[in-house]
Swiss-Prot record:
Keyword Hydrolase attributed: no
Listed GO CC annotations: cytoplasm
Name of the gene this protein is made from: modD
Name of the featured protein: Putative pyrophosphorylase ModD
NCBIfam families recorded: modD
Domain of life: Bacteria
Family statement drawn from the similarity comment of this UniProt entry: Belongs to the NadC/ModD family.
EC number from the UniProt entry: 2.4.2.-
Source species: Escherichia coli O157:H7
Alphabetical list of CDD domains matching this protein: modD_like
InterPro entries tied to this protein: Aldolase_TIM (IPR013785), ModD (IPR006242), NadC/ModD (IPR027277), Nicotinate_pribotase-like_C (IPR036068), Quinolinate_PRibosylTase_N_sf (IPR037128), Quinolinate_PRibosylTrfase_C (IPR002638), Quinolinate_PRibosylTrfase_N (IPR022412)
Keywords for the protein's UniProt record, in alphabetical order: Glycosyltransferase, Transferase
Pfam families documented for this protein: QRPTase_C, QRPTase_N
GO MF annotations in UniProt: nicotinate-nucleotide diphosphorylase (carboxylating) activity
GO biological process, one term: NAD biosynthetic process
Length: 284
């Protein structure tokens, strides 16, 4: 479970509600008791519910029921029902709707990618990068995990990933073995992940025996060729495809023999359509 602190929950609310809801105040309806319900119009893989519930309870509202993150909702299915003071209901409405729409958009997009991949490779995986929209990293992470995806890198401090931009600063930027051996010495408990930008680099990297080799922006044919020769060069190395991988392009790589894909595409998926209904208690 991704943990969002109370300060982070407060920040999600404060973007919209710090001054209260003027319309509710002007109508003098804030004292009434009521209900709020959130519905997913088009259905799909759900996320953001646990965050939304924390936002609701922060406003002093009571959760009556809620679906679980990662569940598959039918079109029009209710995700959350909560009750409480009408002023708080109206304050939380849009901020919570935004969290649910963005989160569900991310999780459902990734869920569709995983379904496509696992039709071909039941053991296939998709890892999502740290290149999330600024300020959304934790929301993105909970959405990715809800859909069954992997977190590629939560940050740059806990994993090794050798890019060309690192190698540019080495005395010999083509010395893959030297770089990988140095990384193993100085980070002995970590897997060594490297990225290649060309087939020539990929072959040189494989000969240096990394744990994981990322192929960046390789064509399907190039990826297939590397996948065919990799077992003889580095039998224990896992291959991954990255760069331009999305729901549209993924199908072009399903015959190359690689089962791990790395992407940031879900973060930029269209938001889900969340319908919100607020009603006074007497009408329920």
């Amino acid at each position: 479970m991704i943990f969002l602190s109370q300060a982070q929950i407060d920040a999600l609310l404060l973007e919209d509600i710090q001054g209260g809801d003027l319309t509710t105040r002007a109508l003098n309806i804030g004292h009434q008791h009521g209900y709020i319900e959130f519905f997913l119009r088009q259905g799909g893989c759900v996320s953001g519910v646990s965050v939304a519930c924390k936002m609701l309870t922060t406003l002093g509202l009571t959760i009556d029921d809620a679906v679980s993150d990662g569940s598959q909702a039918n079109a029009g299915q209710r995700l959350i029902r909560a009750q409480g003071n009408a002023a708080a209901l109206h304050q939380g409405w849009k901020a919570i709707q935004n969290v649910l729409e963005w989160s569900c958009g991310v999780s459902d997009y990734l869920d569709q990618m995983l379904a496509l991949l696992r039709e071909r490779y039941p053991d296939g995986n998709i890892a999502c990068t740290r290149k999330a929209i600024p300020g959304t990293r934790l929301l993105a992470s909970q959405a990715i995990l809800a859909a069954g995806g992997l977190i590629h890198r939560a940050g740059c401090a806990e994993t090794i990933l050798l890019f060309a931009n690192h190698r540019h600063f080495l005395h010999d930027n083509q010395d893959w073995s030297g770089a990988i051996n140095q990384l193993r010495r100085h980070a002995p408990e970590k897997k060594i992940v490297v990225e290649a930008d060309t087939p020539k680099e990929a072959i040189a990297a494989l000969r240096a025996q990394p744990d994981v080799l990322q192929l960046d922006k390789f064509s399907p044919q190039q990826a297939t060729e590397i996948a065919q020769i990799a077992p003889s060069l580095a039998p224990h190395c896992t291959l991954a495809l990255t760069g331009g991988i999305n729901l549209t392009t993924l199908k072009n790589y399903l015959d190359c023999g690689i089962r791990l894909f790395i992407t940031s595409a879900p973060y930029y998926a269209a938001p889900a359509d969340i319908k919100v209904s607020l009603q006074p208690a007497a009408s329920i």
